[in-house]
Amino acid sequence: HEDWGCKRIHGYLSKTMKINIKKVHRIIKENNLQVETYHKKNGKLNTYKGTVGKVADNIINRNFKTDKAHKKITTDTTEFKYYEKDKSGNYQTKKIYLNPFLDMFNSEIISYSINKRPNYKAVEEALDKAIEITKDQKEVIYHSDQGRLYQIPRYVNTLKENGITQSMSRKGNCLDNSIMENFFSIIKQEMYNKKVFYSFEELEQAIIEYIYYYNHK
């Protein structure tokens, strides 16, 4: 794939063979296959507003490995930009927000929502779908950063009511949720980089199609 970077190629090849990431990097370099680096602002939405509710312990503690599906789930919100004409015919920058829930077992996106506003309703839509998928498992953990939408009682109580343990990254430490950061990097490199979208519907459809491709590739 022309937009795949070293890490993505290594991950794909590792499914069928043993290969060192350094060797993958060397082969890419020798054959001049390196993709153009993604330079756009990462678009990660900073929803941290201090402690506005309950901050959970960092139970995951960067241990993203699990031998069963639907046991360790993580989430976050990221933004994408598109352009839309106003009444004067001038293009205005608009934003779209993606709220995915990712299974750490295989990095599959088990649910997501796409919205024009980064509010709790958007998160709740994806959360409800994720819980429906993981409800038959025991000792399930849902991880996130300390964003305000994950601290509020409605989110915390929904997890409790469904027997789900909540885990949160430490403040300002993106590596505590690097598995989700990696997905955001991949989707923006492969679907969003060097492309311009001119409506909410166009960008929304591109995200939907990409997540399907990502999950089924």
Can you name each region flagged by the protein language model?
Residues I9, V24, I28, I60, ...:
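Mobile genetic element proteins and their domesticated derivatives, centered on retroelements
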Residues H1-K68, N173:
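Basic, flexible linker segments flanking DNA-binding modules
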Residues L45-T47, T51, S144-Q146, I152-P153, ...:
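RNase H-like two-metal-ion nuclease catalytic core shared by retroviral integrases
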Residues R62-I110, K116:
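An active-site-proximal beta-strand-loop segment
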